[in-house]
């Protein structure tokens, strides 16, 4: 601990600050970003940190405002532009029809009897540039049409789609939440993408097995013309549903996938070349192009050039500005999480907690996972849950030095998937669009699906912690 600061007093400040954060998010009209900053100030004040910058005898400077601004700016300096580019890219995917083209491509690739797999993979890719809610709204009509065409449960197909969406959204940058966590933990984005994809695959498989093995048989329903659920046995077969979708004016396969695949490939090339210490000549150019800001920017430019050819300038700019509005909220929340983490780091509270857990023989890797799980269950937002957990635990794990930062970051991301229910907007999007109205069925459709993904993520984090 910093001299003149009490570990127990700072810990009390943290507990009260988190209680204030949860109260403000749940019971007031105060936005999560403002609540994060208020909670950060409460932690510092109750913990005894100087209100303004103060220099101690050992030469260290400390102050609540200094820590807040340092944490906020430091977190966003590396990822702010990437988040902005990524959210705008997502808006382009929405209005261009690229997401629908992805869905149809995977349906054709997987063929009959593998509709759940096709929808899960579609969600897996679509969610990288597009938010879960928007992605499901855009692609769910295709899932419904597929269910009517093959006479399969729309619940199983829809849950597989939603599962693919939320898994990637929670685990793989450059989606905003994981990217924010990567920034707070200061881990390499390329490594985070590669490991995130590897972690997401078993999670998606588990969701597919649940959709095919349980939901398809226990909830054999299809949407009627008015959107309500009816038994498959009562439904009139319509073999032309998918054909009509394929005839829509959508961008081509290459045009749809290239703006998404290009940045990922460039970032991964950068990671590999940097690891091999190949940084001169042409390798240096590739490393430059593989910097996340440049790579995502190139993907955005490619999307503008190829996917907006049939969209008028006014519409394109208006939709991209909507994306910028969404980016603003994400940037503020992410920066707020960074400010929270900086208070914990600067005060020495992270070291204090790490030493206490070490003496108690409590596995440190459980801390970010359980905090993310708890915040998620209490207030509903997966992004807020993982950012809050990262802000609290990144300095603690760094002080301990026994947990790989990448593993800690994924623990924050995985914990945010726990039991989506009434306080999660995506819970309502999925169930309402699928026509599920009974609470028990809503839990079976979506809450259990996310909890399965959460359990697999937890197991993967524990295994990773043994080897990394």
Model-assigned labels for residue ranges:
Residues 1-88, 101-105, 109, 266-336, ...:
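Hydrophobic transmembrane alpha-helices of multi-pass solute/ion transporters
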Residues 2-11, 194-319, 468:
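Long, contiguous bundles of hydrophobic transmembrane helices that form the permeation core
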Residues 13-26, 37-47, 83-88, 123-126, ...:
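Hydrophobic core segments of alpha-helical transmembrane domains in multi-pass membrane transport
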Residues 80-86, 109-142, 331-337, 360-400, ...:
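Hydrophobic alpha-helical transmembrane segments of multi-pass integral membrane proteins
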Residues 87, 101-104, 134-146, 175-185, ...:
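Re-entrant/interfacial helical elements at transmembrane boundaries that shape
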Residues 94-99, 109-113, 146-157, 183-190, ...:
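Juxtamembrane helix-boundary/capping and inter-helix hinge elements in multi-pass membrane proteins
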Residues 112-127, 150-170, 190-197, 201, ...:
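Alpha-helical transmembrane segments of multi-pass membrane proteins
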Residues 150, 191-241, 414-468:
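Juxtamembrane and boundary regions of transmembrane helices in multi-pass small-molecule transporters
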